[in-house]
Amino acid sequence: DEVELSNLQRQVVHGDDDVGRKKVDSAAEFVSDLNPDVDVERHDLRVSPDNVEALIDGYDFVVDGTDNFRTRYLVNDACTLAGIPFSHGSIFQFEGQITTFAGGDDSPCYRCMFPEAPPAGMVPNCATAGVLGVLPGTVGCIQATEAIKSVLGAGDLLDGRMVFYDALKMEFDSVEITKKDDCPVCGDDPAIDSVHDVEYTASCAITRDAEPAVSDD
């Protein structure tokens, strides 16, 4: 994935001179320049069922900032099966949502909320609908806060809670997320024991019917 001019208004890692460069190289150099004591490991590849387990192996926390349902389900399944906590963040126009899946016995996962992806074309992407330039940074800072808290064992994570941010109204709301007993990944009788049990296509579908487990806080 290469840096494009349209990327520059919503992040601080890449600059105008980086247009056309690989994002992984530009981002790694930015972090190294900011703090040369940080050990940056580059992964110049597309996440897939064949490599996701090796990619997350050895990490204490994963930050999911992906922009498509296929990869979100893949990251969820891999982290949940491996017992690695991870933060989920997504954005749309003027709104963002963030939660942390801690992987505990009572912790829900992404499939507890959304067992399957919405039909193709139902949710517009950011290229079509647009996104407020500062919104990714706002959501990303909250995710970074969750990562630091998790590593330090400090405070309370957004485990079992989803935070919704409305930039136009400058409001934060949260809803409770409940673990589902029939979740195909973290439920009592899981149907998914490996990322190779799922065909990560448009729907990321499995054979079990379930309803989203989100309730008003």
Locate predicted features:
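Adenine nucleotide-associated cytosolic modules
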Residues: D1-D217
